[in-house]
Amino acid sequence: MAVNVYSTSVTSDNLSRHDMLAWINESLQLNLTKIEQLCSGAAYCQFMDMLFPGSIALKKVKFQAKLEHEYIQNFKILQAGFKRMGVDKIIPVDKLVKGKFQDNFEFVQWFKKFFDANYDGKEYDPVAARQGQETAVAPSLVAPALSKPKKPLGSSTAAPQRPIATQRTTAAPKAGPGMVRKNPGVGNGDDEAAELMQQVKVLKLTVEDLEKERDFYFGKLRNIELICQENEGENDPVLQRIVDILYATDEGFVIPDEGGPQEEQEEY
């Protein structure tokens, strides 16, 4: 069973973000560049496999996860490993999967202390354990949806406006008989770019609204799940029925890996 670590205070033993990334990359032979990339949960799953072989169904971990429901699936695998090894830590999944620096940095600081308290120094080949898989580069929850239009060169909404403005200012000083014919083309390009930018804004607002609605209901389901876990030893048939409904819903939602949720359902 695992040695639990409860201290969350900031001390001189805490690593900086750069040192933390160096430790993770060296230990797991990864190439993470940002703390935010830990939001996929894959690195934590492999660390658990390193600490407690067999505690994690590593073959089911999605190291190339790029979507939030894939992150959640990885954290469900991690939660199952925590439960199996008697780890008391509650994983703030709903916060971690957002990919925000502060939430992920706080959790990895705790995990580093947990790792140090449980690591026995045995040899471990991380690349062979994950069958050569590498983590996805810079996972983002919103950027992939916004980067689909091909005309804007950057992922942000402001970036495409700058070259457009440059085209206007450079065209004005060169106004003359040879250049007047090209102005309509530039104007059409501006109109097309403006229309694409408007579409991007609409899509972004739609995504944000859907994420808020999803997070609202996910938070409620997560709270219900925690209550059920806290009282799971009471053998209450009502609680068991609630748990069955919760995980049946998850199984139907996470379509990409039909085998994973069923096994985790038994572990919970």
Curated annotation (Swiss-Prot):
Every Calponin-homology (CH) domain range: 14-116
Modified residues (N6-crotonyllysine): K66
Modification sites for Phosphotyrosine: Y124
Region (APC-binding) residue spans: 220-242
Region feature (Interaction with APC): 206-211
Record region (Interaction with MTUS2/TIP150): 124-268
Pfam annotation, one family: CH
Main localization (coarse): cytoplasm
Top-level taxon in the UniProt lineage: Eukaryota
Modified residues (N-acetylalanine): A2
Maturation and modification: Acetylation at Lys-220 by KAT2B/PCAF promotes dynamic kinetochore-microtubule interactions in early mitosis.
Family: Belongs to the MAPRE family.
The protein, known as: Microtubule-associated protein RP/EB family member 1
Species in which this protein is naturally found: Mus musculus
